[in-house]
């Protein structure tokens, strides 16, 4: 039976095995998928050994940049992102790297939540790998403006310059952000520590601005609580992004696109009972 996995460290918390088991049951695809705790000091060797038999893998923290350097060929979106979250073993044994994070977030926003980006003013918080992965698909939706804000302004400016050929994208520090915005996406890990990036209240227009945190938890994240208190029209978390990026990876491996809605519903129910 074809074998797949997710590489990470730590990895015990991963929902990917459940997601892909549900996808396989739904589509009738015969495969096994498990979580692999990869060593911090030898990810390349560990991954190569898996791919002596394995057909594909997802990659989570902290190995996305190492996976980018490991592969024999890259998709255009992975090249742009500078990170790989999906590995595919080709027929000749070479490894191809792709990045489905941006496609997953975009599909969660547009298909699941009905959020339009075209002609809108969009603020992305953070300039790390999570944000790098979504810039290309976001700019493909032709927003009026896409602003990247980061604690270190230079990093945001440099990142914006890398993607300037794709649309109206700029970078700045948190203190320089002037609102309001139609959509704000938190790509920082601040919510994990219960923090929120230091933003002016003007970034949110009550009743209009949609706020999305790439993090998720049983209770609303710190960022989404902050947004709701300031009148955001809607607050969304990253659980849908997790499911949608997995669906995109499943499609790359198997050529079958699973229905994500029932899987997302299952995960929501499970999260509520934790």
Swiss-Prot record:
The active site is at residue 64. Homodimer. GO terms for cellular component: cytosol. CDD domains: NAD_bind_Shikimate_DH (cd01065). InterPro entries: Aminoacid_DH-like_N_sf, NAD(P)-bd_dom_sf, SDH_C, Shikimate_DH, Shikimate_DH-bd_N, Shikimate_DH_fam, Shikm_DH/Glu-tRNA_Rdtase. It comes from Pseudomonas aeruginosa (strain ATCC 15692 / DSM 22644 / CIP 104116 / JCM 14847 / LMG 12228 / 1C / PRS 101 / PAO1). NADP(+) binds at residues 76, 126-130, 150-155, 214, 238. One of its GO terms (molecular function) is shikimate 3-dehydrogenase (NADP+) activity. Belongs to the shikimate dehydrogenase family. Its EC number is 1.1.1.25. This is Shikimate dehydrogenase (NADP(+)). Shikimate binds at residues 14-16, 60, 85, 101, 216. Pathway: Metabolic intermediate biosynthesis; chorismate biosynthesis; chorismate from D-erythrose 4-phosphate and phosphoenolpyruvate: step 4/7. The keyword Amino-acid biosynthesis applies.
């Amino acid at each position: 039976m074809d074998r797949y996995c997710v590489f990470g460290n730590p990895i015990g918390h991963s929902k990917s095995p459940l997601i892909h088991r549900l996808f396989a049951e739904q589509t009738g695809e015969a495969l096994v998928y498990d979580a692999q705790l990869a060593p911090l000091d030898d990810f390349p060797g560990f991954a190569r050994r898996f791919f002596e038999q394995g057909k594909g893998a997802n990659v989570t923290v902290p190995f996305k940049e190492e996976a980018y350097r490991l592969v024999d060929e890259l998709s255009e979106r992975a090249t742009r992102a500078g990170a790989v979250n999906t590995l595919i073993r080709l027929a000749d044994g070479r490894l191809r790297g792709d990045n489905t994070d941006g496609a997953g977030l975009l599909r969660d926003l547009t298909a699941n939540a009905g959020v339009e980006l075209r002609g809108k003013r969009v603020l992305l918080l953070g300039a790390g790998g999570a944000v790098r992965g979504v810039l290309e698909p976001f700019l493909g939706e032709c927003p009026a403006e896409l602003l990247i804000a980061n604690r270190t302004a230079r990093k945001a400016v440099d990142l914006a310059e890398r993607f300037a050929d794709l649309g109206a994208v700029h970078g700045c520090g948190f203190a320089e952000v002037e609102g309001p915005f139609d959509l704000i996406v938190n790509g920082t890990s601040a919510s994990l520590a219960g923090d929120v990036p230091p933003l002016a209240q003007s970034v949110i227009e009550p009743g209009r601005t949609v706020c999305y945190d790439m993090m998720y938890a049983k209770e609303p994240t710190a960022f989404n609580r902050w947004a709701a208190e300031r009148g955001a029209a809607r607050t969304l978390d990253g659980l849908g992004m997790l499911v949608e990026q997995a669906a995109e990876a499943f499609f790359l491996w198997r050529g079958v696109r699973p229905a994500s809605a029932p899987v997302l519903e299952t995960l929501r129910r499970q999260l509520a009972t934790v």
